[in-house]
Regions:
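Contiguous, well-folded functional domains in the mature portion of proteins
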Residues: 1-268
Length: 268
């Protein structure tokens, strides 16, 4: 299966998934959503709308909102921005981020920015499984400085692939949001993957598709976009991975490899 990913038309398949996930024909979207809930064990009791037939299309279900109060926001300085599992975390040594045992990639490659290679001290990589809540929230109070769309591959980001393919996160398509906080600049990296139909933010809307072949930078210094800890910042329209990069003056991370997190839970 790993080798097959190099042969598959990754972007074509993701575009097809984008269209399929927006089919509004009731029997198609309801049957597929019902299968998905059963296959992946989605807890619909948490959803604000529990009736799967009430969703406009599959993507509407996939990016569903939760009932009020289910994700309380911790008083700690930094919270988990998503529901998911910690696939890696720790210190960034010599500007290298651990991907898996024996594999790493550079900060500059991930961000497509050599000037930020030595800007961060620690990281957390959080994998969102198909059953998870797929909205992304602010890990702390911050002001949006800039955002960068970086084109790339669309390899799967499941653990088997991450353990097998070098530099997956710095090779895959990604969207990087830079925020100024009380303890310095943080980066929230949304990593795309095969079948991730699109990524979107609250301030720009849908970023992909269309897919481009060049890096695109968005500057926000004059717009004063301020977000509070726990505010929604974006969504995966089909899921993937979020990487959080923290600066040297940030509180220390207090999470473990393999730990399951809920959005709003303290990570420091």
């Amino acid at each position: 299966m790993i080798f097959l990913q190099f042969l598959l038309p990754q972007h074509l398949l993701s575009r097809l998934m984008f269209r399929f996930a927006r089919i509004q024909v009731p029997w198609i979207k309801n049957r597929f959503t019902s299968w998905f809930v059963s296959k992946y064990g989605v807890n619909m009791n948490e959803a604000e709308q529990e009736d799967i037939s009430a969703y406009e299309h599959f993507n509407d279900f996939f990016t569903r909102s939760l009932k009020d109060g289910l994700r309380p926001i911790s008083d700690s300085k930094i919270i988990s921005p998503v529901d998911g599992v910690v696939s890696q975390c720790g210190s960034i040594d010599e500007s290298k981020i651990i991907q898996a045992k024996g594999k790493s990639y550079s900060v500059s490659a991930l961000l497509s920015d050599k000037s930020r290679n030595d800007s961060y001290a620690s990281f957390a990589t959080i994998y969102l499984s198909p059953k998870d809540y797929h909205r992304i929230h602010m890990p702390c109070d911050g002001t949006l400085k800039s955002m960068k769309y970086i084109p790339g591959n669309l390899f799967s980001v499941n653990q088997n692939t991450v353990n097998s393919i070098d530099h997956v996160f710095s090779r895959n398509e990604r969207l990087v949001c830079f925020f100024e906080t009380d303890f310095g600049e943080i980066a929230v990296v949304m990593v795309g993957a095969i079948f991730v139909g699109s990524m979107q933010t609250l301030w720009e809307g849908q970023i992909t598709p269309p897919y481009t072949k060049s890096v695109k930078t968005f500057e926000y210094k004059n717009r004063q976009i301020k977000l509070s800890k726990g505010d929604e910042l974006g969504r995966f329209n089909m899921g993937s991975t979020v990487i959080l990069l923290l600066p040297f003056d940030s509180p220390s991370l207090n999470i473990e490899l393999g730990e399951s997190l809920k959005m709003g839970q303290s990570v420091t």
